Amino acid sequence: MDVVLLVKAAIMGVVEGLTEFLPISSTGHLILAGALLGFDDAKAQVFDVAIQTGAILAVILVYWAKIRATLHALPSERQAQRLAFNLAIGFFPAVLLGLLFGKAIKAHLFTPVVVASTFIIGGLVILWAERRAPAATRIHTLDAMTAPDALKVGLVQCLAMVPGTSRSGATIIGGMLLGLSRQAATDFSFFLAIPTLIGAGVYSLYQERALLTVADLPMFLTGLVFSFLSAWLCVRWLLRYIASHSFVPFAYYRIGFGLMVLVTASTGWVPWVD
């Protein structure tokens, strides 16, 4: 058993868990962390997607009471049926775009310039959204969302296929701009993450199954466990944070991180691959 590899897997798991549900892009951070650790080959890229399962399990645990109540009410209550329908509608655009353009996006957009640009642009969008969104709020609970609202959030989620955008950032900020409260947008983003990230993980593992062996299992399990633990802590913290704070600090972080990516790429401090 390669202890160094397991340590790298644990670090990558922590990075995934801490960044998946904050509006700061887990993909961008995983690219940078992988480059710094020398953990960036084809198998590592599959690993990065697979350990999202740990983060998703954390969300399921945090929201388990709501999920269980919805599942129990699904056969008979319209509110539960509406939520399930809205999640299906929100999930569909990412599935379609991923199947059509996933390989092309991975081949051409995973570059430092793209990652840095989307970090900076995303930060500026958050600053703008936080100024505009509160005045436009019309939806305060998931029960008040309509199918068109869910579809629009699902379309915005597609932007997250560009590395550095942030899936949670796109859906939360997009939801706020569409009229959802910060809490409702965050809740829908986290619920929408469950089918989206599970689907992406299963599809990636299936597509790259030839790269994987039984010997890789300890590495994947280590990453998954650390992803789960760090995501559980992060989601619980974020839900408390948004009750009385805005996303403005994350905007400044994104801008600073984007500038750092440009510097490390141009100086060669981090071996980014163009």
Curated annotation (Swiss-Prot):
One of its GO terms (molecular function) is undecaprenyl-diphosphatase activity. Pfam families: BacA (PF02673). GO terms for biological process: cell wall organization; peptidoglycan biosynthetic process; regulation of cell shape; response to antibiotic. One of its GO terms (cellular component) is plasma membrane. Keywords: Antibiotic resistance, Cell inner membrane, Cell membrane, Cell shape, Cell wall biogenesis/degradation, Hydrolase, Membrane, Peptidoglycan synthesis, Transmembrane, Transmembrane helix. Its main location: membrane. The chain crosses the membrane at residues 21-39, 44-64, 85-105, 109-129, 185-205, 214-234, 247-267. InterPro entries: UppP. It comes from the Bacteria. Its EC number is 3.6.1.27. Catalyzes the dephosphorylation of undecaprenyl diphosphate (UPP). Confers resistance to bacitracin. Bacitracin is thought to be involved in the inhibition of peptidoglycan synthesis by sequestering undecaprenyl diphosphate, thereby reducing the pool of lipid carrier available. This is Undecaprenyl-diphosphatase.
